[in-house]
Amino acid sequence: MSLMAHVRRKLCRGHLLRCTLPLTLLLFLTVGLKHLAIDCNLAHNNDIPMGSCMASYYTALNLSAPGEKNCHRIIQGDTEEARRALLDNLMVKKRRLVATDGDYINATSDCKFFRERRKYITFSLSQVEQDFPIAYSMVIHDNIEMFERLLRAVYTPHNIYCVHVDKKSPESFQQAARAITSCFDNVFVASKLESVVYASWRRVQADLNCMEDLLQSNVQWRYLINTCGTDFPIKTNAEMVKALKSLNGHNSMESEIPPNYKKRRWEYHFELKEDSNKIVQTNTRKKPSPLPVPVFSGNAYIVVTRNFVNSLFVNPTAKKFIMWAKDTYSPDEYMWATLHRFAEMPGHMPAHQKYDTSDINAIARLVKWQSLEGDMNKGAPYIPCTGTHRRQVCVYGTGDLNWMVQQHHFFANKFDPKVDDNAIQCLEEYLRYKTFHPTENVA
């Protein structure tokens, strides 16, 4: 026996606590640190993380934008930094390669690697979010990279996502979309697909197909949000849950008295010309709507309760109205808005004009219409678009971000990586940071 062992044994004789307490403490620290390491290890944790793990999780899952741009300064409104990013975008987009359908088909051959490489958040971040699942109806037809980035931005394991893929889309796009969805238990392609035509009934039917599938899922979601492939969130999932709870069971969408020029869209019978994929007005006037309220104007994007969605399929009057709308022009721009004012629909708002809601006041979608852009000091609702315009709608640029993140909407439309990918990259970085640092004021 060594001299030190002999001395230690002699000191411990008759002093059991003196010797066992340090050993017990050492054992406790060893086991405790081991479990702490496991709790903060993404490979071992599918549970809600402890607050002490959030920093290490963010380090592993951050989506810092590539290049030299400073997204934090851009989001905070640094006009010089935004200008540099816009100039950088002009140079980068000439040589940037957008991910193809084939790239995603290959990348998803190993789903675990795909989820890790693309930094999906595969665990719930709070009990509040876990107890308030959201359903998504995602209608897409092209640009697989934009769809996948949108999915990653809104993905949580407790939500449920239905993806409607246009039947007219190239086979490679459809395969890529199915490949991506196959990597998640709570993401699926709609059971019935439509050949969507702009301004036709089929655009509404695409959402209805997803709604029906979502009602049949095992997830007891509370609200439904519908999106398209050019949307991107400007709120985290936690922020959306907080806002949805504050609705107190009401829906949120644009719903206003329509301008006169829009009324012909539902006053006349329209036909879809299959050879040209265009909607054509006939001389046949339609019978009045079966609803006991006037027709209201809105848009395709809505935030509605589960009970509202269920009533679309079971309320007799709502079903008659849906049938009545099938031969009209762009029914998505008035059907939801009108049903929202029907007293038998859950979460409705009264039909009186005092309850009219503009797209600015609704939370569903932030859109900049070219005709309304201008100097806000002179009464314009928003500043000019810094990207470009498509169908009179702003395709956002980096310079729009500071204004955008100060709005209350859940999503903004439109985005396109071919127009300004820096805008999307900075939003990705901003949202991921806020997700793991919810109490910080980043903007």
Swiss-Prot record:
Sugar attachment sites: N62, N106
InterPro entries: Glyco_trans_14
UniProt cross-references to Pfam families, sorted A to Z: Branch
Catalytic activity: a 3-O-[beta-D-galactosyl-(1->3)-N-acetyl-alpha-D-galactosaminyl]-L-seryl-[protein] + UDP-N-acetyl-alpha-D-glucosamine = 3-O-{beta-D-galactosyl-(1->3)-[N-acetyl-beta-D-glucosaminyl-(1->6)]-N-acetyl-alpha-D-galactosaminyl}-L-seryl-[protein] + UDP + H(+); a 3-O-[beta-D-galactosyl-(1->3)-N-acetyl-alpha-D-galactosaminyl]-L-threonyl-[protein] + UDP-N-acetyl-alpha-D-glucosamine = a 3-O-{beta-D-galactosyl-(1->3)-[N-acetyl-beta-D-glucosaminyl-(1->6)]-N-acetyl-alpha-D-galactosaminyl}-L-threonyl-[protein] + UDP + H(+); a beta-D-Gal-(1->4)-beta-D-GlcNAc-(1->3)-beta-D-Gal-(1->4)-beta-D-GlcNAc derivative + UDP-N-acetyl-alpha-D-glucosamine = a beta-D-Gal-(1->4)-beta-D-GlcNAc-(1->3)-[beta-D-GlcNAc-(1->6)]-beta-D-Gal-(1->4)-N-acetyl-beta-D-glucosaminyl derivative + UDP + H(+); 3-O-[N-acetyl-beta-D-glucosaminyl-(1->3)-N-acetyl-alpha-D-galactosaminyl]-L-seryl-[protein] + UDP-N-acetyl-alpha-D-glucosamine = 3-O-[N-acetyl-beta-D-glucosaminyl-(1->3)-[N-acetyl-beta-D-glucosaminyl-(1->6)]-N-acetyl-alpha-D-galactosaminyl]-L-seryl-[protein] + UDP + H(+)
Cellular-component GO terms for this entry: Golgi membrane
GO biological process, one term: protein glycosylation
GO MF annotation list: acetylgalactosaminyl-O-glycosyl-glycoprotein beta-1,6-N-acetylglucosaminyltransferase activity; acetylglucosaminyltransferase activity; beta-1,3-galactosyl-O-glycosyl-glycoprotein beta-1,6-N-acetylglucosaminyltransferase activity; N-acetyllactosaminide beta-1,6-N-acetylglucosaminyltransferase activity
Bilayer-crossing regions: 16-33
Chain ranges on the Cytoplasmic side, renumbered to this chain: 1-15
Top-level taxon of origin: Eukaryota
EC number(s) on file: 2.4.1.102, 2.4.1.148, 2.4.1.150
Keywords assigned: Disulfide bond, Glycoprotein, Glycosyltransferase, Golgi apparatus, Membrane, Signal-anchor, Transferase, Transmembrane, Transmembrane helix
Subcellular location: Golgi apparatus membrane
Pathway(s) per entry: Protein modification; protein glycosylation
Disulfide bonds: C71-C228, C162-C385, C183-C210, C394-C426
Topology relative to the membrane: Single-pass type II membrane protein
Lumenal membrane side: 34-443
Main location: Golgi
Record-stated family: Belongs to the glycosyltransferase 14 family.
Function in brief: Glycosyltransferase that can synthesize all known mucin beta 6 N-acetylglucosaminides. Mediates core 2 and core 4 O-glycan branching, 2 important steps in mucin-type biosynthesis. Also has I-branching enzyme activity by converting linear into branched poly-N-acetyllactosaminoglycans.
UniProt name for this protein: Beta-1,3-galactosyl-O-glycosyl-glycoprotein beta-1,6-N-acetylglucosaminyltransferase 3
Taxonomic path: Eukaryota, Metazoa, Chordata, Craniata, Vertebrata
